[in-house]
């Protein structure tokens, strides 16, 4: 979805000689990389062991969306289930991007607002802007602010609603959002490193702390509350 949107955004460059072969190679590499999952799944489906059932639409995507406060939660419980948004967040699994990615996006905005920092690396500024834009789009699609239910109620878009419903859960947009915002945070550090190296070090340390501390808490919570996982097993 986001690859198609990117290609449409830069359609003049998409079909040029250096870009189109690179996109085809990336698509081929993605397919090969996922064969470890696709081949067994197809075998199970052919053998009748696994069947994909259930009809989903955009209304179901809204039901599985995430609150903004939940999206940037720093400390959450280590296990749980994906409840309906109408049931609140109690007992849900950790559905969060974390404060580290939010801080990375904020640092990048500070970088592009400073002309001296922004001009230090045009490539980093351009890549960071693209990843920030698409990353925020993915986060918006996962949030309860996205008008999934309005799309479901729009009769001319029923076919699109059913197609998008195959995603099943809105929080699956967290995967591309995470990868895109990680690149955005790295671009922020790169921009500051060339002009203000001390600020870049402080930003990198802050991002590292905001990543390690919640991860450590998550492991601690899992080891102390789960009956299946103990400290000895780790």
Each model region followed by its residue ranges:
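Hydrophobic/aromatic-rich transmembrane helices and adjacent perimembrane loops
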Residues: 156-191
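Membrane-interface helix-loop-helix junctions at transmembrane boundaries of multi-pass membrane enzymes
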Residues: 12-23, 106-149, 196-199
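Hydrophobic, lipid-facing residues on alpha-helical transmembrane segments of integral membrane proteins
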Residues: 24, 28-32, 132, 136, ...
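Periplasmic/ER-lumenal interhelical loops and adjacent helix-loop junctions
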Residues: 19-116, 127
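Transmembrane alpha-helical segments
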Residues: 4-9, 104-111, 178-193
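Conserved alpha/beta enzyme-core scaffolds, especially Rossmann-like or related mixed alpha/beta domains
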Residues: 1-5, 25-27
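Membrane-interface helix-loop junctions at the exits of transmembrane helices
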Residues: 33-50, 68-78, 129-168, 210-227
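Basic, alpha-helical nucleic-acid-binding regions used in initiation and control of genome expression
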Residues: 227-234
């Amino acid at each position: 979805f986001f690859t198609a949107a990117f290609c449409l955004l830069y359609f003049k460059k998409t079909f040029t000689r250096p870009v189109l072969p690179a996109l085809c190679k990336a698509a081929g590499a993605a397919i090969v990389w996922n064969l470890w999952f696709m081949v067994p799944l197809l075998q199970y489906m052919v053998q009748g062991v696994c069947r994909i059932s259930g009809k989903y639409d955009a209304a179901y995507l809204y039901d599985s969306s995430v609150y903004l406060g939940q999206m940037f939660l720093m400390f959450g419980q280590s296990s749980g289930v994906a409840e309906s948004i109408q049931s609140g967040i109690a007992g849900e699994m950790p559905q969060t991007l974390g404060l580290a990615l939010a801080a990375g996006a904020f640092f990048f905005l500070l970088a592009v607002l400073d002309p001296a920092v922004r001009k230090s690396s045009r490539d980093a500024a351009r890549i960071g802007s693209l990843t920030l834009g698409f990353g925020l789009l993915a986060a918006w699609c996962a949030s309860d602010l996205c008008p999934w239910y309005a799309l479901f109620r729009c009769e001319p878009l029923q076919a699109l609603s059913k197609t998008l419903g195959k995603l099943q859960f809105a929080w699956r947009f967290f995967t591309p959002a995470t990868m895109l915002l990680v690149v955005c945070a790295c671009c922020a550090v790169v921009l500051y490193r060339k002009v203000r190296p001390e600020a870049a070090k402080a930003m990198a340390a802050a991002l590292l702390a905001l990543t390690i501390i919640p991860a450590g808490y998550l492991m601690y919570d899992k080891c102390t509350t789960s009956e299946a996982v103990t400290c000895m097993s780790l």
